[in-house]
């Protein structure tokens, strides 16, 4: 939206019962190119990066140029408004909630709204009796004559009082008395809230500020119950409770130990009618707080350049205050001096503390200007980093390995604990499972800077170069009183022999461990955290140093749900969509993929609405609503882009399988119930985890397993028995473990063992010298038992075999393959016709063909594979017939055209269309014989009776 033309205006509050804006059209025409009276819709926001409002403003030529009057929208009463033209999206559907009042006729309500081409927004009140519940396809658009309305009547709005502004409170006007309130802590503290532009803000409801005679942007004072005062700059925030305020996190901490001035539950205070004393700062002294970023010469140089310029642009500061400067590390490392480039797309932060402000102790709060002298002290500050509350912290608290790390770090960084013990944690797991995210989130909570080094940086380095690099790294670490030393990718340091064993004695490892030992001083609090993909590849020298090993697996459903709640917080999802259903569809997705999923969904929604004729800007400003279709498109797009997919879901539906209705019902009941109603199994009831499909070959066992995965949106892994076997001792069992481990990580998942009898025969009967088959069966039994005990991992195992009598009997005991489903031959004509319909649904059949009649002519012993062969032969027969017809046409034309040239010239003619006729099927039937004889079928029936 960078090309959208905007103009700035000063907003003024207007006491009016309506929700509207007034502006001088004459001024707006001059100030805003593209503004026309006949289409006078405009978009207003206090900041181009946050959502605003669409208005059809009322013309008031008496208003001063550059001003806008606003009523009913306190969140727009800021220092300035950005105004731009917009073509609002027309609403297709609106659902209203109306208080049940007989005097309000439903049709009259709709006509009144349609008649004035109202602009509606989800969760807005049209008046005290009507709430806009749902809008489609955007949350903020214009009504026209074609908009469909649905009205739901209710007895009352119990929440009306807290949502609607009471205009009588504004009419009381300015008072000179203090206002009682509660200071609420913010749920999230991110680096952006600590920037210079935000570090002194106090977020106040408009009516509270108005009633003490203050304006947005003016200095205010809060007096706490213990007599202390907090000073800051008023910032109107409409979603704040009417009797509470929120402080910028920078205003919480003013002492060396970062003790917050407010409690977690909230602190009672007064908004003092008399404001604080304010003066110009003649000189400000700043020190950097030790973090890894500040030890980068180029990053620090770029940050110092930015902080000098930003401080000179009138910011409000107090002594002992902390703030940060965001920096684009790529631009900083390229020695750029362009402030705009350095502060755009930032990914690094340099923290500063205000040491002194001159004139000393003269004012409560100071503001800066171009004449303010800024001193950047080269000595590091003794202050600790502030405690951040990043959005992912809620996820950390429900993610078991992150939760353990959080608990250990809380105990270690407790100031009441005596320092001296420096633990070593080893985090291991597949890539993109959240190891780095967990460390960053936990560290931010405990004010501990993270000093990161990757093993790739010194894997091939010489001993001298490595020692020099690590010496500098350690020197920077010890400058901070507490820190986390984060060593990534430790398995890079391992050296393997030809037999696959880890060779000890790597020089790099010895140097690394010796340097880490230098950090472990009795005075400091330092935690060492290492990461790796596989703990089996870690040298024993490192394993002997680690105190705790935490395994990071693929995200489970409830963990993905918590992440989606965080990442999807800033997008608009259709209220009919459950995030739990979305989480079910995102199995095996990583942190990064879930983080970018909301952006993909928004793009899909914009693309969908854009096809109706609106431009990108209008759609985005109107708030596109994400539908289920957008969710599916986005998930499929991410899966296609994913290069390391573990398993894929096959595209086989129930409709693709003819017959087998009994088997379908059993599988649906067995597998679908624990997925849809997990609460049924929360009281100790164990869901069935194993199903064995047995019967003659060609009856659809593999196809049925694929359909289960597709219909229930499960990951699917198909294992042919011999694939697991390996010539080396222990490798076959390891292969079995790996299959189940990956399935657990990708739950809900289906493991399909085809030809199960080839890897799980009777134990004791194998002729191999190492008893490999017996060990594989034992490992398989252990894995089946483990998944049946874990209610939180939805892993279903489906086995398929022609000979269940050859299987080890232990596999068929309760808790393993305890449900046996026989897939026999569909002898009924109705079942065979159903199979034919499923197999030929993509064919172009002759209009006169009757599949029921074809089914009558089929042999009773035809299996599903035989029916597939019948259809394939019928297609080949049709192709031969059509080829002969074309040859005759070429001969009749008297030309020397080849068959290919003839097709090119006549490709659009209906006469070339290939249609399957009854004769094609009958020709194929004459040649086809059942693949299973009567004797074999009799033997399978005996096996069925044995296991039924």
Curated annotation (Swiss-Prot):
One Pfam match: Vps4_C
Q: Which InterPro entries match?
A: AAA+_ATPase, AAA_ATPase_domain, AAA_lid_3, ATPase_AAA_core, ATPase_AAA_CS, P-loop_NTPase, RecA-like_PEX6_r2, Spast_Vps4_C
Residues that bind ATP, according to the entry? 695-702
Q: How does it sit in the membrane?
A: Peripheral membrane protein
Q: Which SUPFAM superfamilies match?
A: P-loop containing nucleoside triphosphate hydrolases
PROSITE patterns given in the database record: AAA (PS00674)
Give the main localization category: cytoplasm
One GO term of the cellular component aspect? Answer: cytosol
UniProt keyword list: ATP-binding, Cytoplasm, Hydrolase, Membrane, Nucleotide-binding, Peroxisome, Peroxisome biogenesis
One GO BP on record is: protein unfolding
- Indicate whether Membrane appears among the record's keywords: yes
Catalytic activity reported: ATP + H2O = ADP + phosphate + H(+)
- Drop me one GO molecular function for this one: ATP hydrolysis activity
| The UniProt record lists the keyword Lyase | no
Q: Which cysteines are joined by disulfide bonds?
A: none
Q: What is its EC number?
A: 3.6.4.-
Where in the cell? Cytoplasm, Cytosol; Peroxisome membrane
Q: Any idea what job this protein has?
A: Component of the PEX1-PEX6 AAA ATPase complex, a protein dislocase complex that mediates the ATP-dependent extraction of the PEX5 receptor from peroxisomal membranes, an essential step for PEX5 recycling. Specifically recognizes PEX5 monoubiquitinated at 'Cys-6', and pulls it out of the peroxisome lumen through the PEX2-PEX10-PEX12 retrotranslocation channel. Extraction by the PEX1-PEX6 AAA ATPase complex is accompanied by unfolding of the TPR repeats and release of bound cargo from PEX5.
Q: Subunit info?
A: Interacts with PEX1; forming the PEX1-PEX6 AAA ATPase complex, which is composed of a heterohexamer formed by a trimer of PEX1-PEX6 dimers.
Identify its protein family.
Answer: Belongs to the AAA ATPase family.
| Name of the protein described by the UniProt record | Peroxisomal ATPase pex6
What organism, scientifically named, is this protein from? Schizosaccharomyces pombe (strain 972 / ATCC 24843)
High-level lineage: Eukaryota, Fungi, Dikarya, Ascomycota, Taphrinomycotina
- This protein's encoding gene: pex6
């Amino acid at each position: 939206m960078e090309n959208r033309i905007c103009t700035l205006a000063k907003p003024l509050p207007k006491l009016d019962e309506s929700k509207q804006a007034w502006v001088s059209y004459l001024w707006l025409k001059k100030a805003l190119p593209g503004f026309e009276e006949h289409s006078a819709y405009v978009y207003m926001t206090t900041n181009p990066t946050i959502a605003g409002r669409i208005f059809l403003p009322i013309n008031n030529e008496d208003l001063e140029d550059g001003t806008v009057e606003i009523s009913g929208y306190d969140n727009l009463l800021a220092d300035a408004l950005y105004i731009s033209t917009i073509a609002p999206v027309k609403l297709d559907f609106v659902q209203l909630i109306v208080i049940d009042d007989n005097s309000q006729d439903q049709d009259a309500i709709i006509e009144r709204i349609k008649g004035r081409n109202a602009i509606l927004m989800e969760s807005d009140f049209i008046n005290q009796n009507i709430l806009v519940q749902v809008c489609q396809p955007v949350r903020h658009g214009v009504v026209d004559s074609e908009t469909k309305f649905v009205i739901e009547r209710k007895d009352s709005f119990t929440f009306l009082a807290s949502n609607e502004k009471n205009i009588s409170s504004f009419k009381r006007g300015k008072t000179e008395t203090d206002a009682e309130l509660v200071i609420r802590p913010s749920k999230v503290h991110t680096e952006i809230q600590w920037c210079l532009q935000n570090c002194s803000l106090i977020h106040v409801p408009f009516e509270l500020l108005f009633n003490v005679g203050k304006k947005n942007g003016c200095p205010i004072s809060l007096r706490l119950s213990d007599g202390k005062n907090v000073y800051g700059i008023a910032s109107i925030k409409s979603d704040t409770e009417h009797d509470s305020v929120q402080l910028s996190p920078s205003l919480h901490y003013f002492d060396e130990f970062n003790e917050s001035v407010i409690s977690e539950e909230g602190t009672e205070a007064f908004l003092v009618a008399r404001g604080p004393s304010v003066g110009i700062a003649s000189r400000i002294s700043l020190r950097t707080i030790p973090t890894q970023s500040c030890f980068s010469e180029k990053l620090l140089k770029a940050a110092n350049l930015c902080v000098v310029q930003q401080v000179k642009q009138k910011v409000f500061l107090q002594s002992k205050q902390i703030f940060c400067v965001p920096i684009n590390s790529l631009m900083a490392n390229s020695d750029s001096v362009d402030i705009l480039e350095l502060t755009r797309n930032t990914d690094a932060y340099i923290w500063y503390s205000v040491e002194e402000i001159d004139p000393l102790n003269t004012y409560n709060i100071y503001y800066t200007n171009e004449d303010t002298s800024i001193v950047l002290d080269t000595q590091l500050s003794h202050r600790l980093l502030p405690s951040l509350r990043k959005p992912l912290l809620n996820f950390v608290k429900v993610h078991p390995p992150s939760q353990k790390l959080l608990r250990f770090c809380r105990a270690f960084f407790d100031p009441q604990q005596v320092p001296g013990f420096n633990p070593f944690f080893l985090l291991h797991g597949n890539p993109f499972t959240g190891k780095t995210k967990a460390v960053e989130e936990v560290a931010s909570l405990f004010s501990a800077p993270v000093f990161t080094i990757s093993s790739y940086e010194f894997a091939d380095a010489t001993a001298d170069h490595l020692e020099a690099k690590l010496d500098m790294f350690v020197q920077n670490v010890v400058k901070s009183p507490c820190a986390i030393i984060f060593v990534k990718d430790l398995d890079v340091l391992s050296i393997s022999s030809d037999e696959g064993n880890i060779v000890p004695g790597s020089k790099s490892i010895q140097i690394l461990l010796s340097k880490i030992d230098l950090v472990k001083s009795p005075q400091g609090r330092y935690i060492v955290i290492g990461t790796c993909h596989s703990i089996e590849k870690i040298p024993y020298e490192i394993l002997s140093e680690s105190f705790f090993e935490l395994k990071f697996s693929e995200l489970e459903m409830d963990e993905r749900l918590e992440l989606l709640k965080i990442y999807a917080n800033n997008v608009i999802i259709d209220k009919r969509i459950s995030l739990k259903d979305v989480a079910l569809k995102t199995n095996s997705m990583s942190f990064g993929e879930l983080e970018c999923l909301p952006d993909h969904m928004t793009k899909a929604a914009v693309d969908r609405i854009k096809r109706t004729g609106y431009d990108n800007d209008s759609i985005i400003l109107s708030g596109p609503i994400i539908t289920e279709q957008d969710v599916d498109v986005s998930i499929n797009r991410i899966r296609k882009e994913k290069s390391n997919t573990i398993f894929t879901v096959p595209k086989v539906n129930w409709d693709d399988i003819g017959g087998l209705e009994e088997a379908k019902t059993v599988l649906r009941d067995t597998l679908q119930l624990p997925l849809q109603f997990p609460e049924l199994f929360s009281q100790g009831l164990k869901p069935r985890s194993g199903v064995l499909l047995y019967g003659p070959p060609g009856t659809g066992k593999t196809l049925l397993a694929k359909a289960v995965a597709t219909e229930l949106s499960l990951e699917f892994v198909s294992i042919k028995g011999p694939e697991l076997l390996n010539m080396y001792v222990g490798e076959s069992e390891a292969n079995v473990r790996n299959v189940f481990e990956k399935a657990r990580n990708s739950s809900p998942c289906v493991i399909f063992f085809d030809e199960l009898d080839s890897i799980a025969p009777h134990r004791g009967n194998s002729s191999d010298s190492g008893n490999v088959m017996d060990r594989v069966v034992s490992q398989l039994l252990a894995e089946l038992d483990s998944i049946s005990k874990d209610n939180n991992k939805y892993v279903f195992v489906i086995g398929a075999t022609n000979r269940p009598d050859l299987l080890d009997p232990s596999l068929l005991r309760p808790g393993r393959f305890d449900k046996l489903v026989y897939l026999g031959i569909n002898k009924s004509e109705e079942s065979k016709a159903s199979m034919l319909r499923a197999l030929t649904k993509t064919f172009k059949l002759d209009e006169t063909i009757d599949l029921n009649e074809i089914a009558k002519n089929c042999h009773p012993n035809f299996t599903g594979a035989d029916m597939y062969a019948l259809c394939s032969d019928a297609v080949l027969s049709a192709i031969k017939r059509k080829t002969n017809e074309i040859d005759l046409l070429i001969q009749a034309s008297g030309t020397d055209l080849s068959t290919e040239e003839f097709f090119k010239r006549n490709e659009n003619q209906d006469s070339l269309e290939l249609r399957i006729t009854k004769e094609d099927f009958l020709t194929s039937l004459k040649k086809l014989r059942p693949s299973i004889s009567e004797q074999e079928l009799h033997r399978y029936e005996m096996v069925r009776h044995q296991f039924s």
